[in-house]
């Protein structure tokens, strides 16, 4: 992280650029949470801080709005922003200097579980649409409804099995987090963060296929759901990071 905040009297002076500042394009957005380096000589997990920055502060600039799969996600929006000698009161510091990583880690476990819950919900919607399309009497090919064609029976069955597996894994991770905390539940949380979005993506893709061209149009929510779930494989850590965490946990069981 290159963005910095330097204490100058009673104010922090902030400099840096930020990509994917979610919500910055919304006219209702009035304040930003800025994570930056305040203590570069501290141990690596104690170098960063979070500071509140009002949007109208001098030196805050939206460079461009970012597109996701070709969409600008207006009015919510994700911004590329630049901060040039932005001054804010030192009271805008959250929790304390060097505690930004601590704040971030505190929400990552619950946040990842929440992501997975939404992924399971998206999968359920896609499966429902797939089934309804499959038995629609107005959608017939070769004298049969669509569910009876190709491998659609298998796709429907696999989707239910995978959804249930994702749900039970997520419930297990949530229960463990509630009883023993984020750190002890880290492997279970990492597992679901990989599994649930990938399951949702597969089911949405199957639903798109049975809908044909309609599946990628504005007539169903499937295309936007697919884009959202694909970004979820990057949000709060990409799949590869979580797989690495799971593998390290498993290997650790057998290392002295």
What is the meaning of each model-derived region?
Residues 22-36, 64-75, 132-149, 179-184:
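Short, charged helix-to-loop "capping" segments that act as catalytic/coupling loops
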Residues 58-87:
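Flexible, small-/acidic-enriched active-site or ligand-binding loops
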Residues 10-11, 15-63:
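A short core secondary-structure module
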Residues 24-28, 43, 70-75, 108-118:
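Short alpha-helix boundary/capping segments
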Residues 2-4:
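Beta-sandwich/jelly-roll carbohydrate-recognition scaffolds of carbohydrate-active enzymes
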Residues 7-12, 80-85, 99, 106-256:
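Alpha-helical interface subdomain recognition
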Residues 62, 92-97:
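Cytochrome P450 core scaffold surrounding the K-helix E-X-X-R motif
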Residues 19-20, 26-27, 38-41, 56-58, ...:
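Short, glycine-/Ser/Thr-/acidic-enriched flexible segments
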């Amino acid at each position: 992280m290159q963005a910095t905040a330097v204490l100058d009297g009673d104010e922090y002076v902030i400099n840096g650029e930020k990509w994917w500042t979610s919500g910055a394009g919304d006219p209702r957005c009035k304040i930003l949470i800025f994570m930056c380096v305040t203590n570069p000589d501290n141990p690596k997990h104690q170098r960063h801080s979070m500071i509140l920055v009002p949007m109208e502060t001098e030196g805050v600039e939206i460079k461009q709005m970012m597109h996701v799969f070709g969409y600008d996600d207006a009015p919510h929006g994700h911004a590329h922003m630049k901060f040039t000698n932005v001054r804010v009161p030192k009271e805008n510091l959250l929790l304390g200097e060097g505690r930004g990583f601590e704040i971030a880690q505190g929400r990552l476990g619950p946040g990842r579980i929440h992501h997975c819950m939404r992924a399971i919900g998206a999968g359920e919607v896609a499966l429902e649409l797939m089934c309804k399309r499959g038995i629609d009497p107005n959608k017939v090919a070769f004298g049969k409804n669509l569910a009876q064609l190709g491998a659609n029976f298998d796709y429907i069955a696999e989707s239910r099995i995978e959804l249930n597996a994702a749900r039970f894994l997520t419930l297990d991770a949530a229960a463990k987090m509630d009883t023993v905390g984020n750190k002890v539940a880290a492997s279970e949380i990492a597992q679901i963060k990989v599994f649930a979005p990938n399951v949702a993506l597969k089911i949405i893709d199957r639903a798109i296929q049975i809908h044909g061209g309609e599946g990628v149009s504005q007539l169903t929510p499937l295309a936007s759901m697919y884009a959202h779930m694909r970004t979820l494989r990057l949000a709060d850590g990409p799949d590869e990071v979580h797989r690495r965490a799971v593998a390290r946990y498993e290997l650790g069981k057998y290392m002295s």
